[in-house]
Every structure is written in C-alpha cells, then in structure tokens.
C-alpha cells in the first residue's frame, strides 16, 4: 500500500511541476521588464516539485519493479490533461481521450495482479 501512496505522490508532484513549467512559459510572454521575476519563481517551483518527485521515485523503485511502476506512472497523462483543462481551459479531443483511455486500460492490465 505504501508503494501506491508513493506512486500517487510522485504523480501529483510531477503534474504540479508540469503546471509550473506551463505557467513559467506564460510568464515569459509578459512585457520584458515584468517577466523575469515571475518566470524564475515558476521555474524554481517546477524544479523543486520535479526534484521531490524524482527523489520519491527513487524510493519507490526500491519497492516496485520498474516494469510495473513506470507504466502506472502514465496516469500522469490523465492528471495533466485534466489540470490543463481546469487551469488553462485547454480542450482535449475525443481522440485524445480515447488514447488516454487506452493508456488507463494498459495500466489496469499491468497492475491487475498487484
């Protein structure tokens, strides 16, 4: 059970790091004299979140085989897509959702015996 809590935490940290990177990219579009500070803050936040995720990932790999853990981490596709829709108003096509459903089905197949 601890392994799955770690995996969820890694997924959430990675997703949050991706959102911070998106925000940094948007901050870079601000006028030149306003963009440096917010861009650096968002980039620093991304580095911290992604670094924490990586450290927990290393811990997780002590408990789960890579061949099991890595495919399950693909749940990030769902998290990032939902977060992008919620925070940035991005739209996903039905083909996009079909691809995500295929990924989730694959995750189910891999984790069925765990």
UniProtKB/Swiss-Prot annotation:
Keywords: Cell inner membrane, Cell membrane, Lipid A biosynthesis, Lipid biosynthesis, Lipid metabolism, Lipopolysaccharide biosynthesis, Membrane, Transmembrane, Transmembrane helix, Transport. It comes from the Bacteria. It holds the Pfam family EamA. The keyword Cell cycle does not apply. Gene3D superfamilies: 1.10.3730.20. SUPFAM superfamilies: Multidrug resistance efflux transporter EmrE. GO terms for biological process: lipid A biosynthetic process; lipopolysaccharide biosynthetic process. Signal peptide: none annotated. InterPro entries: EamA_dom, Flippase_ArnE, Small_drug/metabolite_transptr. The chain crosses the membrane at residues 42-62, 64-84, 94-114. Heterodimer of ArnE and ArnF. Belongs to the ArnE family. This is Probable 4-amino-4-deoxy-L-arabinose-phosphoundecaprenol flippase subunit ArnE. It comes from Yersinia enterocolitica serotype O:8 / biotype 1B (strain NCTC 13174 / 8081).
């Amino acid at each position: 059970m601890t392994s799955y809590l770690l995996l969820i935490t890694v997924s959430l940290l990675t997703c949050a790091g991706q959102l911070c990177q998106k925000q940094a990219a948007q901050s870079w579009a601000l006028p030149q004299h306003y963009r440096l500070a917010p861009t650096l803050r968002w980039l620093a936040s991304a580095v911290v979140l992604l670094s924490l995720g990586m450290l927990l990932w290393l811990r997780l790999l002590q408990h789960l085989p890579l061949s099991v853990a890595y495919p399950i981490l693909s749940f990030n596709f769902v998290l990032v897509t939902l977060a992008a829709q919620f925070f940035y108003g991005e739209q996903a096509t039905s083909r996009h959702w079909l691809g995500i459903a295929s990924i989730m089905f694959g995750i189910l197949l891999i984790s069925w015996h765990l």
